[in-house]
Each structure stands twice: as C-alpha cells, then as structure tokens.
A protein has these predicted regions:
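Positively charged, small/polar-rich N-terminal and surface patches that mediate targeting and assembly
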Residues: 1-68, 72-85, 92-123
Length: 123
C-alpha cells in the first residue's frame, strides 16, 4: 500500500509490504518503443539496439541487488536500474538474453532462497 501524506508543505510517502519472500513480477517487453526507454530513464542510443526490457519486483527489496548480479552473470544483459528500496530491477538485452536472465533469477531465488516466484510474462 502506498500512501502520500502532506504536512506543512512537506510530502511524506509511506510504503508497506506484505511479509514474505517473493518475486511478484518477472516480465519481458519485446521490441519496446524508444519512448519507453526514455520514460524509464534508459538511454535509447545504447539500450534500444538490443530490443528487449526485463522488469522484476521482489520482496524483501534488497534482493534486487542479488538478482541484478545473477542476471548479469547468466546472460549478456545491460543493467538499467536497481532499486534496493522498492525491489525493482530493470535490464535490457536481446529477447533471449532477457529471458535467460529472468530464468536464472527465478531459479536461484526459488531453489536457493526458497522464495515464491511468479511465472515469466511477455508482451
């Protein structure tokens, strides 16, 4: 649950997570438009040539760091964004690189860390 509270011209954001160790999103965006790269803060000059974006979210959020390492070592992906506070991970590569990175992530966290994982989805 996200809540935004305003107090004397200050904004405070409250994020709450449900207890558990889980990957809640593992998605491949194949052939995304260049605008999507820009809106995500990725450099289309570098990242667009590979033509796929991988997105994951995880709790506990610090696991995103481990997931980034696994994806980089398992395939030729380029790291786009890691947020250890929200558990978001974005990376780019060819469709097969992104697929291999996501599969390696899910296999590791499921088998070694005993996380609950979701299926990989693709658009």
């Amino acid at each position: 649950m996200n809540e935004t509270m305003f107090d004397e011209n200050r904004m405070r954001i409250i994020q709450e997570y449900v207890p558990g160790c889980q990957v809640t999103l593992a998605h491949i965006i194949a052939s995304p438009d260049k605008v999507l790269y820009q809106k995500l803060g990725l450099d289309p000059k570098i990242d667009y040539q590979k033509a796929a974006i991988g997105i994951t979210t995880v709790t506990p959020s610090e696991t995103a760091i481990i997931m980034a390492d696994i994806a980089m070592k398992a395939s030729g992906i380029t790291l786009g964004f890691v947020d250890r506070f929200s558990g978001s991970l974005i990376f780019t590569g060819t469709v097969s690189e992104v697929q291999a990175g996501l599969e390696a992530i899910l296999d590791y966290v499921k088998d070694k860390l005993n996380y609950t994982v979701c299926p990989i989805t693709k658009t």
